[in-house]
């Protein structure tokens, strides 16, 4: 069984799901893929302040039509995967980068309205210690980490561009904090080769 790597570059990144996306990699069942990912906002570094903020540099070039969702790596085609089959994803490890961010409020969303956070956004910039698995924000608050991938999935057999925001039967924006290192995710395959 082979080990493959995917780095974030134009040919491996997309901001939507689609059955029409060409795979950036084709693997055999049982192979391992190491993904190096960007954050949800396509951020590639910190601001000049040394912290993450809304001025942090983003991946470029972005296509407004195709890259409006989360920064996804792939898709990966699995030889022999066919609609009606189940894909097992084994999450062997998740190693966070050296920084991260938390952003809440600042736009009219149902949750923000209920919490009265529509007008005033709150931004926390985190320095991450991946060995100690802790993160410390700009206010000195430290939290223990248990990293998980927010978005994992494959396209449905629908034509066109599908948003990364909603979860679907084939995966997507699951935000399942239980999907940590050592766990497995089972998803139904809807298109030829899966395109994970």
Region roles according to the model:
Residues 35, 86-89, 187:
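A generic structural signal for residues embedded in beta-strands
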Residues 40-52, 94-104, 193-196:
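Short, Lys/Arg- and Gly-enriched loop/turn segments at beta-strand edges
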Residues 70, 93-181, 186:
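Intrinsically disordered, low-complexity linker/loop segments enriched in Gly/Pro
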Residues 1-64:
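N-terminal, Lys/Arg-enriched amphipathic/low-complexity engagement segments
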Residues 13, 21-23, 72-77, 175:
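Short, conserved secondary-structure segments in the cores of folded domains
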Residues 8-18, 65-73, 162-170:
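Short, structured beta-strand/loop micro-motifs enriched in basic residues and often containing a Trp
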């Amino acid at each position: 069984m082979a080990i493959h790597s995917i780095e974030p570059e134009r040919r491996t990144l997309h901001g939507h799901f689609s059955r029409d996306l060409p795979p950036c990699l084709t693997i055999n069942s049982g192979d391992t893929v190491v993904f190096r990912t960007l954050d949800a906002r396509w951020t590639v570094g910190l601001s000049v302040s040394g912290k993450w903020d809304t001025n942090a540099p983003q991946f470029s070039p972005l296509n407004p039509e195709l890259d409006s969702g989360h920064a996804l790596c792939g898709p990966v085609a699995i030889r022999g995967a066919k609609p009606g089959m189940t894909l097992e994803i084994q999450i062997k490890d998740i190693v966070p980068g050296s920084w991260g961010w938390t952003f809440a409020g600042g736009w009219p969303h149902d949750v923000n309205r209920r919490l009265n956070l529509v007008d005033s956004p709150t931004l926390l910039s985190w320095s991450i210690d991946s060995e100690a698995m802790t993160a410390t924000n700009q206010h000195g608050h430290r939290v223990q980490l248990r990293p998980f991938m927010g978005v994992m999935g494959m396209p449905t057999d629908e034509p066109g561009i599908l948003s990364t925001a909603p979860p679907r039967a084939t995966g997507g924006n699951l935000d399942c904090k239980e999907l940590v290192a050592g766990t497995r995710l089972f998803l139904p395959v809807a298109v030829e080769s899966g395109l994970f």
